[in-house]
């Protein structure tokens, strides 16, 4: 086997020729899904709450981007922080204190708001700390964390990529590329994707998100 075709060149002697060929025939998820790491507050007790701890009128649930969020004059916004194994949709329990005053504080704390140009955009999210990858649709309006990682594929490919990332095929690639207890954005970037039967996959994924 030519293990050099696998990013990082792991010695995975059990993989097939087809497994290795996908790295040259397919597109890397890093090129079409833009996996990103989000923010770490450095003080979760101060900045985070469960959504049901607050009055609904204090939470902005439909911000399009950072400027839209700040104009809303709301203090709290949906926050994706990973969570338990769950596919397709869910784990939307946290909110973050993210008005202008606290935005400026967070710029100087934790990991200084990396990838903030992507905050509030729809995408796909998964938990960094996990032994098995489970990916969910993340709608517009969410800030995301350093342990609730997020990818940003084009709208026409979002459902297909979500289906692929929740498949046994993708889990097999993750096992080879990232055999540890964490699934970081750099590992996801390396996974190859070959698109086929797109309409059928999109339909199945739509049903899974809905139900």
Language-model segments: what does each one mean?
Residues 1:
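Conserved P-loop NTPase catalytic core
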Residues 4, 12-13, 17-203:
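Polybasic, glycine- and aromatic-enriched phosphate-binding surface used to engage nucleic acids
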Residues 207-211:
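Non-transmembrane amphipathic alpha-helical segments
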């Amino acid at each position: 086997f030519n293990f050099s075709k696998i990013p990082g060149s792991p010695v995975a002697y059990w993989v097939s020729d087809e497994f290795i060929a996908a790295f040259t025939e397919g597109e890397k998820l890093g090129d079409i899904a833009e996996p990103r790491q989000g923010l770490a507050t450095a003080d979760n007790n101060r900045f985070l709450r469960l959504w049901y701890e607050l009055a609904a009128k204090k939470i902005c649930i439909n911000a399009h981007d950072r400027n839209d969020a700040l104009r809303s004059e709301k203090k709290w916004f949906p926050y994706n922080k990973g969570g338990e194994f769950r596919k397709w949709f869910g784990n939307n329990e946290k909110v973050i204190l993210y008005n202008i005053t606290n935005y400026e504080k967070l710029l100087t704390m934790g990991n200084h708001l990396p990838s903030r140009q992507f905050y509030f955009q729809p995408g796909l999210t998964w938990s960094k700390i996990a032994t098995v990858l489970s990916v969910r649709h993340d709608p517009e309006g969410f800030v995301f964390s350093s342990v609730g990682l997020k990818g940003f594929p084009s709208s026409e490919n979002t459902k297909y990529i979500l289906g692929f990332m929740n498949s046994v095929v993708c889990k097999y690639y993750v096992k080879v590329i990232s055999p540890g207890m964490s699934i970081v954005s750099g590992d996801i970037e390396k996974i190859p994707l070959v698109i086929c039967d797109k309409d059928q996959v999109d339909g199945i994924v739509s049903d899974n998100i809905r139900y």
